Amino acid sequence: MTNENVKVGVTALIRISKNSNFQSNKLMQLRTFYFLLLLVLGQQATAQTNTNKRYQGLLWEISGKGTARPSYLYGTMHVPEKLVYNLSDSFFIALRNSDYVSLETDHDVWQEFMQKMKEDNETFGYAENGGYAARNNYNNYTDLYGQSFKLEAPDTRLFEAMFAYKPVMANEFLYRSNGFGEDFEENTYLDLFIFQAGKKLGKKVIGLETMDGSYEAVTRARIPDDDDQEEYNPYGGRYINPNSIRDAYRKQDLNALDSLNSIISPGKNFRKWMLEERNIVMANGIDSIAKMGKNMFSAVGAAHLAGDIGVIEQLRNRGYTVRAVQFSFDTDKKNMAEIEKIRYPVNLSQQWSNDSVWSAEAPGKFYTTSEAWRIEQSLCADMSNGAYYAAYRLKTNGLWTGQTPEYISTRIDSIIYEKIPGKIQERKRFTSPFPGHDITTKTRRGDIQRYKIIITPSEVVMFIMGGNGDYVAGKEGDQFFNSIRINPSKSTTVERATIIEPKPGNIKVKLPVSPFINTSTDKKATELYIAGQEKNPDDGYYFLTRISYHDIDYIEEDTFELNIICEKIAEQFTKSRPTLTPGQMMPYPTQTFSFQSDKDKSYYFGKVVIDGPQYYLLGCRNTTGKSPDAFFNSFEITPSTWPDGWMEKKDTSGEYTVMVPKNEEKQASQLYQNLKKIGEEIAKKARAKYGDNGDYDFYGKNYSGQIVSPQTGEKVFINSYPYESRVFPDKDSLKRSTDTYASADKEMKIKSSTFEEKGDSMIVMTYEVVDTNSNR
């Protein structure tokens, strides 16, 4: 057999990033190249595989078994470095002469997959941790008095961050640029270039693996080996010099690559699921297309190719002839440039934000990728052209603070030059339907980017489009920016009193005008915010919001909390103490406040109502000084209603069942359920490695979970703690211990409690806990 050449693209690992800078949670990033590298002895890098076969090359021809035309297999490295772009004419000939192009997974489904995983993890807890670390646990360090009711105007630094901060996941999906090494990179990582080339050349582009299957296999790879006595490390293994991998790839030496993979693999289970099982799936995919009478160009991580269980041997075992294609490193730049110049035609259709505030025409849906620093980001990645469409939103609270859209537009104008990336090519200001800015820039790489910033009475909405070269300057960019619309019903109002009584929900209020913001109609909304404005802005702006603060260990005095909340609200606008009037909306403590702004002499009125962990704030700002008594007096707390009925929920981790409202219960995907079981197995085996006394394993059985109702702000916390037998000598000692726990070490008073034995193995205790000077 001739020399066997395969491209050395290290193990096709999916890296799970724990970076949560802008994701309100653990944003899991797709990355099919994972550097598990540092330093190791040089001689280890030259270790050979267990097979005597030689795998030399990157491009392989697949023929035989009745195929009319050969297919091709190419080993990639999932990075944009120039090293991997030494592509000869044989590469492009094979690519152009194929009916299909396949990658490990279909890039077109990445965004939807990541969104599904994000939603499941946020709802049910992170699957790979066994589902235990659910979000929104208790109060997430909320500053109830200092920040929760501080409806302030954005600081200039927030605007600066909004403009300078690149869309989360855009680089991960489209470029994989290293930042400092961008002068030594091409426009995208090699796999996506092949994906784009297939699209632009009219090929059918597919994934050899499903996203669910690939992700599950990669997660299974973290399960420790049964016979591994070393301390658990999911990404263990020894380390190697990263240059060893690059050198092996440059030499097209797949045997060396396979050996390097063996060195860095944490164990047999890691290698099985990260490589072996996935290799079988990839080979099956190639085989299925060949049986259809079609030929295909398949590109997978080079580490998947060599060895007895590599894709090459998998195909040979199925009866195919697989041989290396002579492949030089004389880069065919002409072919590459021709493909890069092609614009893949995309159909732009109208897309809406989750709350229908804005719409724009784009190639696909916008997915929320970040919600941090008060800035919400949504992204639509055009994988075929390497372009992205993004929308940023930042609440200004302008109707409450008195900062008009025109004023905020001027504030923004003063920082555009400093904070918008690149050299400004064109800059326009507009005033209709709202004030804003239209800016076109060119980055140091020569990429055109365009920004459209719109300032509505309540928020700043910024639209961005970016891409390689002058892509944004084409018709797609014009169509996107010309199609942007702000929904009039979401930014203006009519003078018609409106009764709002959400179902499910437990409030009722009569707003003097129709609301242009009403999150109570959105079942996915995590906050309650209702707002409307008189036709003449001077006549009044009205809003209702709810802050949830669940503190099960302490109950503050009602009067103290009401006073400090009202004073904190007022101190943003005046140095004088507000006028405070305590009230009682039986059994809920209330307080109204009023003051006049020192700056613009506007009048502020508010009412705070406390219902257990729920704090309601009704507010009004006007220039007439007329108190909105009718609005405040219309507010009621009503019994919760659940029109969709109830259903039973089972939690296998907590080992309990409970009845929950139907519309509150989102079903976890099958992938999530599988990942959760894998996570539990990982945790169990990891715990078993900590000492012989089993202490870690014992405490690791603790459970913490919660059930949340976004519509009402209610939360139920579930905690379980296993006790060894005879920890409590009798029932009285058990009750004394739980009394202490329920009363927060006797800091609060137990108003009533029950003690009930159910059968021989269960005792049920209930507690109602109170504290002095509080109705809660």
Region locations from a protein language model:
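N-terminal targeting sequences that direct proteins away from the cytosol to non-cytosolic compartments
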Residues: 68, 315-388, 395-435, 441-541, ...
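Solvent-exposed, polar/charged alpha-helical surfaces in well-ordered, non-transmembrane soluble domains
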Residues: 89, 93, 192, 196, ...
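A cross-kingdom marker for long, charged
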Residues: 269-345
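Structured, acidic catalytic/metal-binding patches in enzyme active sites
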Residues: 58-266
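A conditional alpha-helix N-cap/helix-loop micro-motif detector
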Residues: 52, 84, 187, 275-279, ...
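Solvent-exposed loop/turn segments at secondary-structure junctions
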Residues: 78-80, 107-110, 213, 302-305, ...
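Bacterial Sec-dependent N-terminal signal peptides
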Residues: 1, 7-52, 58-60, 484
